Amino acid sequence: MKNNLYSVYNDSNNVSFLYDNFCYTKKEIDTKIALLEQNFCKLLNNNIENKRVYLDIKDRFLFLISFFTMKKLNLATVLIPIEIQPQLFFEPGIIYISDNKHHDNGIFLTPDFNLVPEKDFNAENIKDFENIYDLYFFTSGSTGKSKNIGKWSSNILTELAELQKLFSIKKGDVFLCIPPIYHIYGFLFTMLPIFSSATIDLNSFFTPESIADYIVNSKIDYLVAVPSYYGLFDKLNLIECFSKLKGAFSSSGPLPGEISKKFFDKNIKIHEIYGSTETGGMAYRIYAKNPNYELIDYVNVKNYHPTEELELFISSPAISVEYDKEVGYCTGDIVKFIDERHFTLLGRNTRFVKIHGKRIDLGFISANFINYLKDTHAIILGENEIFVGCKDENIYLLAECKDKLNTIQISKDLRKILPGYAIPKRILQTKIPRNEMGKINKVAIEA
């Protein structure tokens, strides 16, 4: 019975890791974990209870061995995105382990699982923490202030069990997961094959072409990627390369419907998972079959109404933050219900600003701009190809569009659609900054 995050690995019978042209069996993985455990306990003088470990690990194989070692020792673990510099999160008393950065008070992890203390590391300075959660995801702050978001083992295990059942994952299935493991989406879909006694391919790829070529020449049953990658596969005419997959998954943002349909036409079903770090997975869909989302079985809606557009409130055992169980957790998403288990996702309710005392929803501007391009110029832009922001009470709009836009004419036309104070002062046709998951990086834009 799996009851903690180490048991995800330890209780799985036929799990294996594919890495660097080698297949590691459970017995071989156990040996690596035991070696790292021994080195870690020796370095810390066996004083590890109530400690907190920050893992900043780039190599996927090292990452998983390190993670399961820390969970075997029952240590609260913080997963750090490799693009984040230590000064953003480092605090005295933590245990910081990295294979790609050096910090004077940290520990460097080598490929052979040696732990090398940096020049100012002192095991006596490691302090105890009140670790409320078993696992923390450090968010980089692409949509706000950087922070740790905690999860209990039960949150993760609930979701893994449901995903395994929902998608009928079998022993022997092989997963290739492109998103980084330190992101909740990448983490869950790296844990899913391990939870299911299947195989996770830990090889890394840096171009869409290399991913497609690898899948053509390897046994891969499930691909896990983000919308931007699926868009590139389409743009580069690579969709045929994925025809032998049993299935594919997408998350971290909406997948454009036309992309879903193009893959579906080649008998490739892309399952979109809708959720967040705080809530876990909430719903799923295959857009090409049905553009509406279906709630995952463990999710209950607290404010169902058959006709109104409203903010979605839910209860779920995958939610890790405190919330009123009677009222439900406010997701911040605006939906319209089809029935009690299906809904259309309309947008977010989190982007209101005031312009000269008047309140305006930036999402309203974005939606009208997208509709205008579609209706007037037959140009299709997805939600992830436009960003509307506000600085010093001036609205600005960024658009990623291959068609040349006449921004002067567009500004004139928008005056017929939007109130004067909501007209963007600047419309720029440009590449929009994104993070590793393909999400729009609002901090980079507004810097």
Model-identified regions with their sequence ranges:
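Conserved AMP-binding/adenylate-forming core of the ANL superfamily
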Residues: 11-46, 151-154
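Conserved AMP-binding/adenylate-forming
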Residues: 39-83, 177-180, 359
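Conserved AMP-binding A3 loop
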Residues: 126, 133-161
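Conserved AMP-binding/adenylation subdomain of ANL enzymes
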Residues: 157-174, 182-222
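Gly/Ser/Thr-rich phosphate-binding loop
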Residues: 222, 234-290
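AMP-binding/adenylate-forming core of the ANL superfamily
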Residues: 300-328, 334-336, 398-400
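AMP-binding/adenylate-forming catalytic core of the ANL superfamily
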Residues: 334-422
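AMP-binding/adenylate-forming catalytic domain of the ANL superfamily
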Residues: 418-440
